[in-house]
Amino acid sequence: MSADFWSSSQRNRWQLTRHSLLESRRKLLLLEKKMIQNGFIKDYPNVEYDANTRIYLHNLLIKLGRRLNVRQIALATAEIYMSRFLIKVSLKEINVYLLVTTCLYAACKIEECPQHIRLITSEARNLWPEYIPQDVTKLAEFEFYLIEEMDSFLVLHHPYRSLLQIRDYLNENFALYGFSLSDDELQNSWSLINDSYITDLHLLLPPHIIAIATIYITIVLKKNISSLRLGANSMSNDTVGMDPHTKPNSNSIHAEDLMALATGGSAINDIGNPSSGTNGFHDIELDENTIKINKFMTFLDHSHVNLNEVVEAIQDIITLYAIWNRYNEMSVKKVLQDMLLNRSV
């Protein structure tokens, strides 16, 4: 266990590169093919661990977490457990609904908000009665399987803490940087972090990089967003935030805002360059938001963070929303249903 990310197992054992992650998934695909050839598992060609499946699993976890009133930090930990596990184990070997339940059960223990095994099994059965067994020992067995595949490294560091530290630092150094994060901006950044767990970012980058990327989307791209909306009404973004009961307001960033940004990354490419960061916004006057952008760029310049990693995180988050816009829950649900119900026949 480590209170410091830089000496933690998360960084030293579980922070991957894109190449190593791709190689791990390639090896898993080869193993899956061998298991199918040897008759250990059946082949379901439509079952893939792609972005659509990850969005579906994310939504399952949120549904179960809300029934149990689980803290957001435990949900985030459960998502990373799930991502790590599915690097090593094929979807075609397991019950994904039991995986979601087990990840949340283990995460609640680690994040010191434990749920009784009978309660979490009962709530999961209420949601997915055809997939969750009544026997609680099945969940306990899966927990050992999960921990083994993660090499027993369970303690995690999340961007939420980094986000709050940045907020506090900006407040304390307002005289130097001349701006701070508003409550709305903090909430927007927090919600973006929630959604970022669908991606591979938490296997690839340090938490503070992801936190800065979400602030960048909220602060810097907000000016582009306002020009891209063209007066259109925005849908509410149904994600778990700092306060799940807070209704979105007109300043909130929504999925279609990020969708528009996914088709044109000029603002992303300007990161770290305060002068060019404002010229692309249709020659707007230096209003309050533009001044804030320049001040945030100054903070970024002083922070000495890896800007290439920040750009990488921003692009992944925006791409996620582009995929989410085309997401079809029923198609993913049907594919998993066919696999799990046919397996039990």
UniProtKB/Swiss-Prot annotation:
It comes from the Eukaryota. One of its GO terms (cellular component) is mediator complex. It holds the Pfam family Cyclin_N. GO terms for molecular function: cyclin-dependent protein serine/threonine kinase regulator activity; RNA polymerase II core promoter sequence-specific DNA binding. InterPro entries: Cyclin-like_dom, Cyclin-like_sf, Cyclin/Ssn8, Cyclin_N. GO terms for biological process: cellular response to heat; meiotic cell cycle; negative regulation of transcription by RNA polymerase II; positive regulation of transcription by galactose; positive regulation of transcription by RNA polymerase II. The keyword Hydrolase does not apply. The keyword Aminoacyl-tRNA synthetase does not apply. SUPFAM superfamilies: Cyclin-like (SSF47954). Keywords: Activator, Cyclin, Nucleus, Repressor, Transcription, Transcription regulation. Residues 23-147 form the Cyclin N-terminal domain. Gene3D superfamilies: Cyclin-like. It is found in: Nucleus. Component of the SRB8-11 complex. The SRB8-11 complex is a regulatory module of the Mediator complex which is itself involved in regulation of basal and activated RNA polymerase II-dependent transcription. The SRB8-11 complex may be involved in the transcriptional repression of a subset of genes regulated by Mediator. It may inhibit the association of the Mediator complex with RNA polymerase II to form the holoenzyme complex. The SRB8-11 complex phosphorylates the C-terminal domain (CTD) of the largest subunit of RNA polymerase II. Belongs to the cyclin family. Cyclin C subfamily. Component of the SRB8-11 complex, a regulatory module of the Mediator complex. This is RNA polymerase II holoenzyme cyclin-like subunit. It comes from Debaryomyces hansenii (strain ATCC 36239 / CBS 767 / BCRC 21394 / JCM 1990 / NBRC 0083 / IGC 2968).
